[in-house]
Amino acid sequence: MDRFPEIFHKVVGELPAAGRLPPDQEFPFSTLRPVRDGFVQRSGVKSWYGVYGEKGPWIAFAPIFQIAHTQMLKATVPYLAEHFRVFTMDLRGNGRSDRPRGQEHYAFDEYYGDFLAALDATGVDCCALIGISATAMTALRFAAEHPERTSHVIVAGGYAHARVDDPRIAERVRAEGERMRTDWPKYLEWFFSMLFPEAHSTKPFEDGVRYGWASSGELVDWGRNGWLKSDVTELAKRVKCPTLVIHGDADKRVPIERGRAIQSLVPGARMLTVGGGGHLQPARDPVMFNRAVRDFVSGTPRGGTWVRAMSRRRRALFISSPIGMGHVQRDLAIAGELRKLQPDLDIDWFTVDPAARYLEQEGERLHPITRRLANESRHFEHVAGEHDLHAFFALRTMDEIMVRNFMTFSDLMDEEHYDLVIGDEAWDVDYYYHENPELKRQPFVFLTDFVGCLPMEAHDGREAHLCADRNADDIEHVARFPYVRDLALFVGNPEDVTDAPFGPGLPRIREWTDRNFAYTGYTLPFDPAAFSDTEKLRSRLGYKAKEKIAIAAVGGTAVGGKLLGKIAEAFPRMKKEVPELRMVLVAGPRLSADSLPKMEGLEVRPYVHNLFEHLACCDLALVQGGLSTTMELVATRRPFLSFPLARHFEQNVHVRKRLANYGADRSLAYAGLTPEALAQRALEAIHAPVCYKPVETDGAARAARRIAQVLDNRWWAKS
């Protein structure tokens, strides 16, 4: 990447082959596939289109300028498709569409013709049109020429003409074209830096560069030339349908005066100014954009039931992270203690598999709207390697999931009344509440067992830069809007927090956490005293008294499948040394038991409900490096070895520090570990004495008391 700008090294990272989409990108969105898609062909050029959603009025996005493609709409289309039928297409020159060579293939009339042909092919009879930037001209032209097929027009960052009669504009256009063709990477840096002036925009900037990289400077120059000299000013005056103009007053690409000009041209048009906003609201301010589009196109108040205030039951919504099983088990323990303090409080749950499955088995109520949630565990499994999960980049690339799930949460808050929202590592709700604090309607309690993203690779300057940027964003959010979190709970003790800095020029994590969180102590989902009679527990669970029980488990995702395979390879040697050994491999809720090795004497089980009971009476546990399982083993004083996922900052830094505080860091690196070495270490561990520090047992009760105080809201009253 030596020819690339420095910001590519710091923010964008390694790029795929230029001029085409990455080979693994079959469709634009990771959380939603089109209900149908295809191509239209005009003059030998094929253009791709997709349709999302199966009910409701039509929304059609006019195809985006060739420097991007449909994936730019990943924060908006998956949500809008819950309420509308949504049409998108890739403009010739990028995405899944053809990339013809030669200026003759690139003209506004060609773009407009492709759009009409694709709308006809999909049977879109009447639609709300959305035109972003240059494609505002497409939307305005269509609305003027086909009023019978247009219900609404929304333009974002748009303009009504691209005339170049001013010599200064002509020279700027010429210089831009030369830069596109001679130094495409540098042009992409300049262009997307201008589009996203908002602080902490590293992810949309990176995405923009990648979208542009799927085309080329030459193609985009031809494509841009096709827009030049276009003018729909007179056509805009003929638009009769409701029109909304959205424009940022800090837009450096298309000054807000261009948006105001559209408002003045279209009779009755409304203007939504985004204070401090740049050029691309669908990418940078998707919550605002999605809600504005939904409300404008719907036109009427949403249905549902409004309950008079004093007729409402007291209700809490508990958002539980579905990554692994530890969150939901501790959350259920907290909920149980909260019910003791607030017996009239109804609790609904907001999560997905595998946490949702656990709650259903426990008889809890999942809100029906959770069927709309995108699955975070599936994303983590998709980006993981062999016992390797770059946790920070897994979080960073989860942006489509986060905004979609927040929008589902936002819909629920619009439709129903809750007295309290509790979010256990609900990063989506926490982030978008801070970005849109006006949406918060009730007290919000935030829980986490770690604070701060930390780089794992010493020589990776990009990871360090982006971790610090994310941390700074969080710090600034909390400082500016302290009222978003009515209570922030750290599941643990002060000494469990690392003293490392958040990044260059940022505070130390421990000092900041002390000022911004209350500590609950560790929160167990059970009382270890209930499992003190291990012989009785073994008998109840079907284990024989003279057996040596080894249990291998990898938590609530499928990421640890390779670890279970390696443990299975070590089993024969262990069995030879300890003939009475009985080993159980637990596949977990998202890993098929059929995928695990089969051999004599090795027991393979699918998901085991409340696995902590089995772990509490085992002679050895071999587990992944997650916090919950390892701390449960510490609490029940069981020998164990843990194998943290490579490059997983939480498991390798935060969890290991906490385990060390309890005298229980039993971590081994998976990489390079042979079955023989694993067997040897396991045999040593099974005979080693356990000297752990006792784990506190009142964490759930302490958390519940704090939460109840938020519900009571009398902390400020004088006694």
State each model region's role.
Residues 45-99:
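Conserved HGGG/HGGXW glycine-rich cap/lid loop of the alpha/beta-hydrolase fold
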Residues 88-130, 134, 291:
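Active-site loop/oxyanion-hole signature of alpha/beta-hydrolase fold enzymes
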Residues 140, 144-145, 150-179, 642:
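Flexible "cap/lid" loop of the alpha/beta hydrolase fold
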Residues 164-170, 179-235:
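Conserved alpha/beta-hydrolase catalytic His-Asp/Glu region
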Residues 239, 245-247, 251:
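Short beta-strand/loop motif that positions the catalytic acidic residue
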Residues 345-396:
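Conserved nucleotide-sugar phosphate-binding/catalytic loop shared by glycosyltransferases and other
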Residues 448, 454-558, 588-589:
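A nucleotide-sugar donor-handling region in carbohydrate enzymes
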Residues 503, 521-620, 671:
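Donor-nucleotide binding loops and adjacent catalytic segments primarily
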